[in-house]
Amino acid sequence: MTSDQDAKVVAEPQTQRVQEGKDSAHLMNGPISQTTSQTSSIPPLSQVPATKVSELNPNAEVWGAPVLHLEASSAADGVSAAWEEVAGHHADRGPQGSDANGDGDQGHENAALPDPQESDPADMNALALGPSEYDSLPENSETGGNESQPDSQEDPREVLKKTLEFCLSRENLASDMYLISQMDSDQYVPITTVANLDHIKKLSTDVDLIVEVLRSLPLVQVDEKGEKVRPNQNRCIVILREISESTPVEEVEALFKGDNLPKFINCEFAYNDNWFITFETEADAQQAYKYLREEVKTFQGKPIKARIKAKAIAINTFLPKNGFRPLDVSLYAQQRYATSFYFPPMYSPQQQFPLYSLITPQTWSATHSYLDPPLVTPFPNTGFINGFTSPAFKPAASPLTSLRQYPPRSRNPSKSHLRHAIPSAERGPGLLESPSIFNFTADRLINGVRSPQTRQAGQTRTRIQNPSAYAKREAGPGRVEPGSLESSPGLGRGRKNSFGYRKKREEKFTSSQTQSPTPPKPPSPSFELGLSSFPPLPGAAGNLKTEDLFENRLSSLIIGPSKERTLSADASVNTLPVVVSREPSVPASCAVSATYERSPSPAHLPDDPKVAEKQRETHSVDRLPSALTATACKSVQVNGAATELRKPSYAEICQRTSKEPPSSPLQPQKEQKPNTVGCGKEEKKLAEPAERYREPPALKSTPGAPRDQRRPAGGRPSPSAMGKRLSREQSTPPKSPQ
């Protein structure tokens, strides 16, 4: 039992040493390099009671760079010596611990007892020194903290005093726009505003302490309630008023050279007969001011008018509360109409950020803004871009003016396409001369044959006009070339509806498109022809029947039996002079005079190509807008509907007007049968009012004329095609000439 107790006694001092070394090492916050190497060499201690030694191993590995102190090294020596003892004891005990008898314990006891006794004096001294020294360090640090705490209590007050003095100094107020903006008319700043400054809050948040410090500052003035503070007015300048500039400086200075007066710094003339005398301090200025008012009183026979002026802060103290400075007035002297506001940029054609011109409001500028197509095409909401292309929205300067080649995506591209093309015919002469603008195959190819050419070979095609011609319809992308119509990246939306919409447009503008190229405008001398130029031809009725059977089969299908045409032949001959008498009043009927002029005799046949050429030239020069021509032809129908005797004559005039000029290259073939053409058309037209309705003769004459002249004699057109044209014309109401 005694041996076991002795072994426990030996193990306990070793454990205490290790534990004290561990604590001392923690107190110094410094790792011991030797500890790591030696603790790694310790074998596992499963049978030793002092197993707490292994707890140092993970802590030793975490420690960083070695920082050695004298106390740490001495403690480390003691701890390492204790560890060496323990390691030696375990190494000696290792083979003996396996014995079954108690000799091993006795040997270990004999070997272990002397070592602690021998190592105790040196090791325990080192271990005793370590903790005692380490314990003194926190005491010193605590005393140091206690000693510095009163300093910190005094320092914040002094630092706060200096900081507040600087914040409210004239040097800082000259540049601190925030404090200036918080000043009232008396230059008072709320103390709470000063206390909320960052560098003041770091020092103290006690408002009472800040007010106390501010009251102790000589350069600032706190109001009676302790709520506001302002810098002291440095009243050190005495102002003398109503002293002329011509007064010598010496005389003014002599006023302040008394024995009881302080010395002034400067004496100078200011403005408006005011003199400034500057003193060093406010007390000196007050003393001089009192001297002048009480003792001198007069100067140059006048009472002295003296004031004390505060030294101005180098700022404008009447700024608005928001802290913004007013602009320099000198800017307006150089730039009279310059504005101080900032507008969002409106991108002109020279700038490359165009999309914002749609988003920003309209600025009615002279130069149109434009859209860059590469920037418009990826725009996700293309309906927003087309939001400005409503037919009812017509801005004065549209941002989509130059988008003629690059229109954005539209649900019905042909809608905007035709909106520009068709109405511009009313403004631009000859726009409809080229049928290729409208890709209408039914109009361009009549029965497989191209419609007669309506312009000179050298005449330029007036398709793309000046953008100013589209000023009324700037809301849409505009007409596009056929090539760019297909290659344009943005024209993909709703192509399926384009053909159906085009057919509707075809119905609306068929008459204007087909009639406008055909009616010629002969020269003005043709208006002066009398009735004698068109005598009735007696033998025309017999020859007419065979010609109409071959050339006017379309008319015979609609009109009916040829008997009625034969019966009305004489009546048409009789009404012809009446028709001609009204000719000069109708612009569209002017061509009939030229046609009748060469009808009576074959002697005029050699001149027919020249006359036709002349008519074509005047047709290209004197062409009116298509709407005017259409109304002229429709006025013929309206007037014809009024009186039944005149109606065939006006319809015949309109038919002859539409037939003769386009077929001028083919006219010599037709003129081989003289004296038959003029009356034949009359006979055919006279029977129409009784058989058919009154309006379609103008349309029937217009598209049917080239078809009858260009078709071979035996051909017969399909009745459904012609009936379709007539049904379309019914939907177009007649217009008055005015």
Curated annotation (Swiss-Prot):
Keywords: Acetylation, Cytoplasm, Methylation, Phosphoprotein, RNA-binding, Translation regulation. PROSITE patterns: HTH_LA (PS50961). Residues 138-151, 450-468, 628-640, 729-738 have a biased composition (Polar residues). Its main location: cytoplasm. Residues 1-52, 90-157, 399-420, 449-540, 591-738 are annotated as: Disordered. The modification N6-acetyllysine is found at K724. InterPro entries: La_dom_prot, La_HTH, LARP5_RRM, Nucleotide-bd_a/b_plait_sf, RBD_domain_sf, WH-like_DNA-bd_sf, WH_DNA-bd_sf. This is La-related protein 4B. The lineage of its organism: Eukaryota, Metazoa, Chordata, Craniata, Vertebrata. The gene is LARP4B.
